[in-house]
Amino acid sequence: MSKQQIGVVGMAVMGRNLALNIESRGYTVSVFNRSREKTEEVIAENTGKKLVPYYTVQEFVESLETPRRILLMVKAGAGTDSAIDSLKPYLDKGDIIIDGGNTFFQDTIRRNRELSAEGFNFIGTGVSGGEEGALKGPSIMPGGQKEAYELVAPILKQIAAVAEDGEPCVTYIGADGAGHYVKMVHNGIEYGDMQLIAEAYALLKGGLALSNEELAQTFTEWNEGELSSYLIDITKDIFTKKDEEGKYLVDVILDEAANKGTGKWTSQSSLDLGEPLSLITESVFARYISSLKDQRVAASKVLSGPQAQPVGDKAGFIEKVRRALYLGKIVSYAQGFSQLRAASDEYNWDLNYGEIAKIFRAGCIIRAQFLQKITDAYAQNAGIANLLLAPYFKQIADDYQQALRDVVAYAVQNGIPVPTVSAAIAYYDSYRSAVLPANLIQAQRDYFGAHTYKRTDKEGVFHTEWLE
């Protein structure tokens, strides 16, 4: 009896769509779900497909060619551990488990270590692109044993999104948790992108009172230039979508932005690594403060502030906001990739930053034209400390920083909250400062806690008795 080439555990929408994606490339796929009904539903809805259902873990595992390749698409956390534990009694040494969930990278490091000790291969794999990407081609970020990756690479390359140059959006990221870490930072960058766009929207509404049709036209024009990206593209569509009553849908959506925690993970990791991930962290905080709707409504009746004054030069202001958005985006990516470098050093992953940018070019939520500029920057100088120092990005900063400053100044003077746009210029100015006022902070630390300090004019470590 012939055996299937790969198995998928978890028939929720992402697992189902990935199974269908794999099947569409000519593979036979064993499918299993903890609840029998879900498996039966998938099979009933996809008659004629090379999906073979199994209703016990043992039968599912035994249906696969060896070394077995099993893709887990189950709820991250305890659900993943439970699924792995159910599989292990039936696996042979050398079999490969691929975790495609939104898993915290430290969990992936642990599972890789534990399964390796038992002779199994474990590949923690970031998958970006949502439901449509899973079905038609996502961006895929696998990390784990390199030799195990080579055994699943043919399948992953066939199901991945394809960039304009024909290259699949998948590459080996690095050992143990590297793939899930890169996916985590991808999600953090996604948070930053979305908040920057939301602030541009607030500025255009507050400063120019643009109609939804005008906003859509503006974003359509932006999408034809430097800002060309998936998120700008969908935003132009969102502005003009109406509900069944003829109302613009975006105008009646409650202004509370939810989150699944991956942005928080990125910010927490930045603190662990000592990385100034200020813009992305502000985007996480912006979602948190948006959730304080009742408090904000009450505060709006108590706390005073300026009323936004209309801007005279409409075209000029739109261009300033566009430039501020693009430079803010560059700062966000500079912070994100700087954190990838710090993590690579900390966890010995030897990440290839140019390759990472390349696999973001299609399939994923942050896909954008300018990602090629990041790949180019690392091709020119693989050891560059920060993307802001690369010639292209330095030139953009030279040309666009005044617009960013003007937009932030307008927002502050007119009471429009722009936490990520503000964070962008604060980071830029801090990073370009040869001298910061941290000398005073270090003096304070030595004053109250004898934490010592270094001097600019002498070698060594010093402590002063400040009250003598």
Swiss-Prot record:
PANTHER family linked: 6-PHOSPHOGLUCONATE DEHYDROGENASE (PTHR11811)
Protein's UniProt name: 6-phosphogluconate dehydrogenase, decarboxylating
Membership in a protein family: Belongs to the 6-phosphogluconate dehydrogenase family.
UniProt-annotated catalytic positions: K183 (proton acceptor), E190 (proton donor)
Molecular-function annotations in GO: NADP binding; phosphogluconate dehydrogenase (decarboxylating) activity
Cysteine pairings via disulfide bonds: none
Enzyme class: oxidoreductase
InterPro entries found in the cross-reference section: 6-PGluconate_DH-like_C_sf, 6PGD_dom2, 6PGDH_C, 6PGDH_Gnd/GntZ, 6PGDH_NADP-bd, 6PGdom_BS, NAD(P)-bd_dom_sf, Pgluconate_DH
